[in-house]
Amino acid sequence: MANAKGKVTQVIGAVVDVQFEDTLPEILNALNTENNGKKLVLEVAQHLGENTVRTIAMDATEGLVRGAEVTDTGGPITIPVGNATLGRIMNVIGEPIDEKGPVEASESRAIHQPAPEFSEQSTGSEILVTGIKVIDLLAPYSKGGKIGLFGGAGVGKTVLIMELINNIAKVHSGYSVFAGVGERTREGNDLYHEMIESNVIKPDNLSESQVALVYGQMNEPPGARARVALTGLTLAEQFRDQSGTDVLFFVDNIFRFTQAGSEVSALLGRIPSAVGYQPTLATDMGQMQERITSTKGGSITSIQAVYVPADDLTDPAPATTFAHLDATTVLSRAISELGIYPAVDPLDSSSRILDPGIVGEEHYQVARDVQGILQRYKSLQDIIAILGMDELSEEDKLTVARARKIQRFLSQPFDVAKVFTGSDGVQVPIEDTISSFKAVVAGEYDHLPEGAFYMVGGIDEVIAKAERMAADAA
């Protein structure tokens, strides 16, 4: 029942117990109270008996006291949605945090929604071109699909997601939503200013902006970090249903959603499961991921960065995420140590749509040939390490030389990394990517030095770089 009144009976960090006189609020209902003159939202997590509910706070609880009055809103957390959110930054409960006044939305939605029915879902497979060679060739993304960027600490997940925002969101005519889940506030701030510079956000005319931002960063309590992905998803769902177009939904980082869920679970006293994660890990992930889908009215293409703890892909958090994805881009520390960026592992990354029926026979064959050469090189590395290159057959020496060129040719300068590399970013059309790698595999460029293939765009740049290298050597 809405407007039922209760009183705070216990505060333990982010967990607040509230006692009601008669009607208990339902699980997931939002409760409002006041703390230090500001509104504090609590979400009901458990019914304890004796008319008491256990709740998780969506903001800091310092200063909250026993006996404080709490009001039941009668429903889940609701946030403003629609065009009024474009160009704005909101927190988990839909409050603006960009100091630009209130969000004047005509519509609001609850952040907990059921996934679309099977009959409403649509299945289509069309490639989403990113302009990044290694992705477009070996693990292409599908429109309306779910894409995961997996990697340990510091291998370039955020740089890659920023480049994808740069390449796709800027040329994408529809709307984008970015959810910053438990990541660095500095990165969130940088992204906002980058979007203003690139005209994706227009501060002078916010209604013409193409992106809405939702942040629940590292410094937030676990309740906020566990729900902010759902807040972003609710915005994306509304854009999909309203505009009927392809909406881009970026999440950085989905692991923090799981991590916050595990913190909340421990605070609620649940017995942990494997590696200390919450017993409801698969359910929490499934409920969220099933909402990110394409319906007959429109589609959501989601790109999610997934932190891999201690570089262990079998950790329950990344392993549970794998099951929901259409394409996985795995970033490897071994490749980043070679100085090859983006540090995408060409053999570990995969895509459901790398299929001749979808991408075409030529693309499929070139991708498989490239992977075949790289796989052969990988299997020869032990022999090279022990006996040296001289012990290899002539055919194997040629394979190794081509593999090293391919490995370097899969690198590419990024626009967003210009400050590190000093060179302008390059986007490569998919036709050029396929024809270039087809020629390299066929041996047409065996005469060029492998250094010419490093950090360039198309094959024309390789030839030009090789000529410059030859001129410098002369």
UniProtKB/Swiss-Prot annotation:
Gene3D superfamilies noted in UniProt: 2.40.10.170, Bovine Mitochondrial F1-atpase, Atp Synthase Beta Chain, Chain D, domain 3, P-loop containing nucleotide triphosphate hydrolases
Membrane topology per record: Peripheral membrane protein
Location(s) in or outside the cell: Cell inner membrane
Binding residues annotated for ATP, in chain numbering: G151, G152, A153, G154, V155, G156, K157, T158
UniProt keyword Nucleus present: no
Domain of life: Bacteria
Keywords in alphabetical order: ATP synthesis, ATP-binding, Cell inner membrane, Cell membrane, CF(1), Hydrogen ion transport, Ion transport, Membrane, Nucleotide-binding, Translocase, Transport
EC numbers: 7.1.2.2
Pfam family for this entry, one: ATP-synt_VA_C
GO cellular component: plasma membrane; proton-transporting ATP synthase complex
Reactions catalysed, as given in the entry: ATP + H2O + 4 H(+)(in) = ADP + phosphate + 5 H(+)(out)
GO molecular function, one term: ATP binding
Entry keyword Membrane: yes
Broad class of where this protein is predominantly found: membrane
Function, as annotated: Produces ATP from ADP in the presence of a proton gradient across the membrane. The catalytic sites are hosted primarily by the beta subunits.
Self-association state and partner proteins as the record states: F-type ATPases have 2 components, CF(1) - the catalytic core - and CF(0) - the membrane proton channel. CF(1) has five subunits: alpha(3), beta(3), gamma(1), delta(1), epsilon(1). CF(0) has four main subunits: a(1), b(1), b'(1) and c(9-12).
Sequence similarity: Belongs to the ATPase alpha/beta chains family.
Database matches in HAMAP family: ATP_synth_beta_bact (MF_01347)
The protein's name: ATP synthase subunit beta 2
Species whose genome carries this gene: Dinoroseobacter shibae (strain DSM 16493 / NCIMB 14021 / DFL 12)
